[in-house]
Amino acid sequence: MTDVPPSSYPYVPLPDRGPLRFPGGARVAMIFTINMEYWEMARPGQKEPLFPGGPATIPHALPGDVADFANWTWREYGQRVGIWRVMEVFDRAGIAPSCTMNGLLAMERRRIVDAVKERGWELVPHNWAQNDLLTYYAHDPAGERAVIRRTLDAYEKIVGRPAKAWLSSAIRGTRETPAFLKEFGLVAYCDYLNDDQPYLISTINGPIVCVPYSNDVNDFNMFARGSLTTRDGVDMLKLCFDQLYAEGAETGRIMNLGLHPHVIGQPHRIAALRDFIDYAKAASNVWFPTREEIAEWYLAHHAEHIPPR
């Protein structure tokens, strides 16, 4: 007897799908994701650095049980300064981004969460602490479930409603993650990097919508890791948008731009965000949805796109 996996999805290549027709005939569903993250200062007994994925702002990251003030405060710049610069850009543009948040950030940086709530922007749980990856619990499903439950409880307490979408910190989920999220009533799982369109993930608790993320179109990979200049970054974003927009005439596409306030919120980089938002807004037939909106819409239309097998 073959064990049933906790979650799975079929391989359906793009040519084998039906056309995806977004609301209003939109060619591109454009998601701006602001990742609002909080790292623990130190964790007793942990020898691995607390900043998984890096890079460090200075080399030679310290063990996780030693406070690394240089790297911790670099990220804190985003909470103290960068996020407010980013918010101002979106306010002026009249675009509502999707904001992910660690549960610990909601507790330690309530001022930021309140500012997002005041604007009516989407809030998406992003694990408890940014450095406490779900993959640390890959062989401890009960431990992973407890972390997710703790995060969702904090989310509901702070936001005032149950969560509907989830992005794991460092996009490090496990095979069990989609099933746990479906069990807790969520409709969207956003960790996977394998598509430009939504699709259904089957779980032992029922289907959940994958709203894909992108690690290529992401300020951390573009600037902190890739060392692009601000102008090169704008050019890259425009090229990506133009390609997806052209393809979207036949079947709709998602473009997700991942943002981190300590990266894009730097004074020499904020122009890249401002210029690209203006560029995307100038195009017709562009949808600026929340992740929840995409998931709910797709649940009603998935059979036209990828028929059940």
Task: Please place each PLM-identified region on the residue numbering.
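Catalytic alpha-helical scaffold of carbohydrate-active enzymes acting on polysaccharides/glycoconjugates
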Residues: 2-209, 234-257, 263-309
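A conserved mid-domain beta-alpha-beta active-site/ligand-binding segment of alpha/beta enzyme cores
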Residues: 212-245
